[in-house]
Amino acid sequence: MSDTVCLKRSEWFVETFFPGIRRCKLDAFRIDKEIFKGKSKYQDIHVFESRGFGRILALDGIIQFSQSDEFIYHEVIAHIPLMTHPHPRRFLVVGGGDGGVLREAVKHPLKELYQVEIDQEVVGICKKYFPFVSGGAFLDKRLRVCFEDGKNFINKYKNFFEVIVVDSTDPVGPGKALFQGGFYTSVFNALTNDGIAIFQLGPFIDFGLIIKSIAKKLKAHARFVCPVRLPMPSYSCGSEYCFMLASKKIDPAKLTPGILGQRLALRLKHKANSLKYYSPQIHQASLVMPKIWRV
């Protein structure tokens, strides 16, 4: 006897990044519990729980993170650039309204942290329904949060930040402007001479369509540009997801696990015990690419 059960479409969340088109696997999550469904000034917001993934946030029909694997995304995008820089003092995250990047960044002995987020309602929703993601980071006294367009904000700064994390949504809706050439120019103008930036890009299946072209744009500003690999089981890519690391002066490939381990112990001390995914070995392995994905 078959265990297959036919369910109503209303009981499922089906991700539709490209309407009517699926280049990756079909992502359908059973909605076991509706938490919140609404619309901000900028985007649709959906919070629900799904068996095996826990609580999930979707914006404009696209999964942003799930409770089961958000730590992978946030630890990689925060610690890889911060650990690559020898003396980071000022840190900026563009986007990241859920607070996950900040949760990881505040573990470092930074002098100042900044966040610019266009959608204040997303921050409020995440504080209410996903307090475990920010982990109290919004209360850090070193942090300044600004609600405005990321490009407008970053244009105010020159040679100021050692590390910038661009944790934007995908290249649709409010995040579209953060995938254009003018924005990249602004990012590198805001970085110090030895500054490092990392950008959320997408699945490696988009390598030829998106990732390779963005790497070319970044090479106009940074001496070292390299993809960063990470697994994201809750994303439509299935597993292989891509960030892009861009460094003006420091070669990320020359950092050994020994050097990274020393920095980790010195900077995070006992806080390193809270890490679930990042390690010096993971750091180094995340930069290793097959030939087809090298830029």
What are these regions (language model features)?
Residues S2-F13, F17, F65-I196, I205-K212, ...:
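The AdoMet/dcAdoMet-binding core of the Class I SAM-like
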Residues S2-H46, C237-V295:
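SAM/dcSAM-binding transferase cores
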Residues G38, V145-E148, V228:
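Short gly/ser/thr-rich secondary-structure transition/capping motifs
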Residues I45-F53:
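N-terminal glycine-rich anion-binding loops that anchor highly charged ligand groups
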Residues A58-L59:
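A general beta-strand register signal
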Residues A222-P233:
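Conserved S-adenosyl-L-methionine
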